[in-house]
């Protein structure tokens, strides 16, 4: 019984983030921020494609802060890979959604809370929830398959139904 090759590889392109979430281990890091170089990313993608792995997921920190994101996602697409992006969603605009849509198959937008007030308390900024909802709409309007993720707890489970209605 051999080990099967992975179906998907996650590539962490940076560890920078535009949030300061109270629960995140990265917010207190005193180390220099790390960005994957364009050349390193291309080598990894070539290796993934050569090994017959079908999917690549771009993660971070916040991958939309990485200056090479569009170029490298396009490169992955040219290699025949299914491309996914994990993001907090706050940096998307109608323009960036339109630019990335042709090379993105799937986007996962993370919600740390189920409403704007709670998101602000956890992440230290106002209006983040609405930015995420706007990003989802912009991406979906461009034909990108968009998913939302969140963590449920005893503190927020009562807001789940309202959250689902918002996403519809």
Show the residue positions of the predicted features.
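Canonical Radical SAM [4Fe-4S] cluster-binding loop centered on the CxxxCxxC motif
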Residues: 2-39
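Catalytic metal- and UDP-sugar-binding loop of GT-A-like glycosyltransferases, i.e.
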Residues: 11, 58-59
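Radical SAM/AdoMet-radical enzyme domain recognition
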Residues: 35-58, 66-168
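Conserved G/P- and acidic residue-centered "switch" motifs that form tight phosphate/ATP-binding loops
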Residues: 62
């Amino acid at each position: 019984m051999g080990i099967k090759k992975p179906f998907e590889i996650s590539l962490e392109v940076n560890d920078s983030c535009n949030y300061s979430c109270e629960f995140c281990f990265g917010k207190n890091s005193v180390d220099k921020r790390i960005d994957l170089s364009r050349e390193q990313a291309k080598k990894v993608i070539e290796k993934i494609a050569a090994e017959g792995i079908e999917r690549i997921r771009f993660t971070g920190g916040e991958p939309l802060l990485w200056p090479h994101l569009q170029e490298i996602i396009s490169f992955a697409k040219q290699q025949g890979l299914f491309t996914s992006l994990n993001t907090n969603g706050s940096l998307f605009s109608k323009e960036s959604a339109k630019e990335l849509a042709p090379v993105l198959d799937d986007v996962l937008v993370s919600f740390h809370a189920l409403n704007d007030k709670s998101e602000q308390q956890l992440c230290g900024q106002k209006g983040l929830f609405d930015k995420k909802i706007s990003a989802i709409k912009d991406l979906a309007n461009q034909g990108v398959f968009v998913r939302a993720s969140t963590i449920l707890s005893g503190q927020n489970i009562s807001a789940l139904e309202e959250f689902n209605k918002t996403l519809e």
